[in-house]
Curated annotation (Swiss-Prot):
One of its GO terms (molecular function) is fructose-bisphosphate aldolase activity. The keyword Secreted does not apply. Keywords: Chromosome, Cytoplasm, Glycolysis, Lyase, Schiff base. It is found in: Cytoplasm; Chromosome. NCBIfam families: Fbpase1_Arch, PRK07226.1. GO terms for cellular component: chromosome; cytoplasm. This is Fructose-bisphosphate aldolase class 1. The lineage of its organism: Archaea, Methanobacteriati, Methanobacteriota, Thermococci, Thermococcales. It is an enzyme of class 4 (lyase). It comes from Thermococcus kodakarensis (strain ATCC BAA-918 / JCM 12380 / KOD1) (Pyrococcus kodakaraensis (strain KOD1)). Homooctamer. Its EC number is 4.1.2.13.
Length: 281
């Protein structure tokens, strides 16, 4: 990688990370990966223009979308909103045992034409199709880096052997392994699971060897403070922020949660105090 490429990567990463080195990124790939039923709690958010307009107005640092959603709603982004385009995905229409592969659904040059600041792809470490996703990621990373664009790996350990040996995919040992694998395959940013404690997540951050690690937001919590506490622990563990979908778009008014997350991530505010300040409790 020459100096021009590395400068391009660093500059584009700053589209997501503030001066504190942290980011709050809104995830909008659920309609494809989980299906439109994910939007049933607040049905108007099935319209990407509506929800993206809301989250951008509330102040998220970046938005992650699939290429088609960018075409539908990309003009809702502000000039300073980071755009992450994900180039792999899968549906939940296939049998569960066949959902251990994310296929490539676009190319780096397509994402760049759409205005991407970063390119993302998923690898299910431990899947029987791990080698396919590893090759996809390697090709995406090589091409993106050649053009000076950062790559983000959604490093998700999952597969029958993981379940058999560790009991769950969130076991810190496999999450740590996935984060290290992401770093060693060239990721500039890593999105991964919560491991259940600040102490174990700190080991995940250490294993990533300096590559920023962001929390995968997961399912919506009934109590917003519970989620804010997890994000607080991620930050305390040295994590670089969170990529959040359902804990935002499954709320009638997502703005208070976004602003509370900003308080926790960027201002180091106590989760309960942040929730009170934004009227969540």
């Amino acid at each position: 990688m020459d100096a021009y490429q590395s400068v391009g990567i660093r500059r584009r990463l700053k589209r997501f990370f503030r001066r504190d080195g942290r980011a709050l990124i809104f995830a909008m790939d659920h309609g494809f990966e989980h299906g439109p039923t994910d939007f049933e709690p607040v049905w108007e958010h099935v319209n990407p223009r509506i929800i993206i307009r809301k989250v951008v107005r509330a102040g998220v640092d970046g938005v992650m979308m699939l290429p088609g959603i960018v075409r539908m709603a990309g003009d809702e982004l502000k000039p300073d909103t980071g755009l992450m385009i994900k180039l792999t995905s899968k549906t939940e229409l296939r049998p569960k045992e066949e959902q251990l592969l994310q296929s490539q659904l676009g190319y780096v040059e397509d994402a760049i034409k759409l205005g991407a600041d970063a390119i993302a792809a998923t690898v299910y470490w431990g899947s029987p199709q791990e080698d396919v996703m590893m090759r996809q990621f390697a090709e995406i990373a090589s091409y993106a880096h050649d053009l000076g664009f950062p790559v983000v790996q959604f490093a998700y350990p999952r597969g029958p052997y993981i379940n058999e040996k560790y009991g769950k995919k969130e076991d810190y040992r496999v999450v740590m392994y996935g984060a290290r694998a992401a770093a060693e395959t060239g990721a500039d940013m890593i999105k991964t699971y919560w491991t259940g404690s600040k102490e174990t997540f700190a080991k995940v951050v250490d294993a990533a060897a300096g590559v920023p690690v962001l929390l995968s937001g997961g399912a919506k919590t009934d109590n917003p403070v519970d989620f804010l506490k997890v994000v607080w622990d991620v930050i305390e563990a040295g994590g670089a922020g969170a990529v959040v979908g359902r804990n935002i778009f499954q709320r009638e008014n997502p703005e208070p949660m976004i602003k509370a997350l900003i308080r926790v991530i960027h201002r180091n505010e106590d989760p309960e105090e942040a929730a009170k300040a934004e009227g969540l409790i």
